Amino acid sequence: MAKFVIAGQADCPYYAKVELLADSLQSKLQDFHVHKIVKTPEEWKPWLQQLCADNGWTHGRSPIIWRELVDRGGKGLLIGGHNDFMEYARSYYGMTSGMLSEMMKNIAAENLAVTQELREEEETIRRQSKPLHVCVINAARSPAYHVLPSLVNGKILREEEIALHLHDSEENLEKLKGLEMEVFDLSFPFLKEISVTTDLPTAFQNAHIAIVLDDFDQGGKEDAIGDMETKVSFYKRVAEAINQTASKDIRVLVAGTGPLNSLVSILIDHTPSIPRQNIAAVAQVKERQAKSLLAKRLTVNSAGVCDVIVWGNVGGTTYTDVSRARVHGYDGAIWGPPSYSCSVSEMVHDNKWLEGEFLEQLQSRSHTIQDSLQHSADLSMAAAISSTLSYWWNGSPEGQLFSLAVCSEGFYNIPEGVVFSFPVMFHKGSWEVVQDIDMNEDMRVMLSSITAQLVEEKDLLLHPTNANHEKLLKVFGVTTDISTPSSVKLDKIMEETEKSSSEDTPEAAAAAVSTGDETVPS
């Protein structure tokens, strides 16, 4: 079976003549099929050039006709233009056209009018479509590669049409273009459009959701001040772009490595037009690591462990609290329906393990993964981004707690304006901090110390100098000997904790303080 493709400029009289002859042949011949492509005068020339380049043809006028063997596949066979098709039809089928020039012109004018009307209708429909604009900043970074499929397949944002904006630096533009092509190749139905850019205001144009991947390669000890200034400058430019072009109800989720809390605080300070509760940082990486270790201990799926809380500075000192953690599906003495859960601390029933081996494994988890992979744990980061964004947009499982770094409004005596990781519950489009967590004195001291560190860290970010060069290195996690817990942050916490020693409690045994990847029992 042969299919003939006839393409032409809408106002071309010769296209009109060829089109009507092909219609006549199709009506008389069972295996003769016609497909038509009509382009406006503005569209025709670039479209024809691209078609010929793709197929290795040489043709410069309207119309162009080629033949495709649809039951065999392979490359189309170029027939040519008006005269070539007329000769082809006369030679093979004994048919020709006697259409006069005046009629050809009239039909061409009618074709042009109809084509323009169709284009206007398409444009009207396009304007009426209101996809969700999602931008990914630093999209050439590895975590984005794992997040994007979940964004466009409906897993995160459900059945929302998406206009995807990918941004990165000029040096990564070719990577962005490759990523754009690959996302197109996924053929997911909810992807309305996709664009790549190196311009931040363009990336944030009408954006409803933004994922900012903070994953800069650090230059090492000598470049600490330069790294700091680069980060702060970048976040100020991000804030400026959000103020200029983003939707006023945009949700901004920051993820990655480094001093995220302080950087998010700077971002909030410079986006006065955006509600500060609409900007947050991912805190679920450490939370998921703790859940995984607890699940392995209890021989359950890690999805069955919930309500692990990570307090504090996502990129620095954190307090990992499992005192309220619950486990579903545990094979214990008491069984119940899927909704039934038990206390993790009670089921582990081993404070020595919680205070020792658990903390050691949690301390080394990230390094162990990175050493095995020979690169950062991008899949873990992507999963944390995906679940956090999904919960924020759709709501989280009822009654469960999750960790999120947000701007404090005085929660748990953390000063207003400090970005801190708290336990939260998500509702559709919003979150709320859970404020009924019981705290002992040790925990209050630790959170107070972490708060002081965050205030100091933000000041270091904004005013880096040679005088505080060593402190800058610690903010970036650059140390001379990573096997030695030399962090001043950790020392400060331990000093303050020793001042208020108390009897061991299940709550204290089920918590951990972590400075980056250094973890000690509380």
From Swiss-Prot:
Identify a single GO molecular function assigned to this protein: L-malate dehydrogenase (NAD+) activity
Outline the segment boundaries, as ranges, of region: Disordered: 495-522
Q: Which UniProt keywords apply?
A: NAD, Oxidoreductase, Tricarboxylic acid cycle
Q: Does the keyword Transferase apply?
A: no
Annotated InterPro entries: Lactate/malate_DH_C (IPR022383), Lactate_DH/Glyco_Ohase_4_C (IPR015955), Malate_DH_type2 (IPR010945), NAD(P)-bd_dom_sf (IPR036291)
Give the EC number: 1.1.1.-
Q: Name one GO biological process term.
A: oxaloacetate metabolic process
One Pfam family per UniProt: Ldh_1_C
Q: Which residues pair up as cystines?
A: none
Q: Which residues form the signal peptide?
A: none
Describe the family membership recorded for this protein in Swiss-Prot or TrEMBL.
Belongs to the LDH/MDH superfamily. MDH type 2 family.
Provide the protein name.
Answer: Putative malate dehydrogenase 1B
* Native species: Branchiostoma floridae (Florida lancelet)
Q: Which gene encodes it?
A: MDH1B
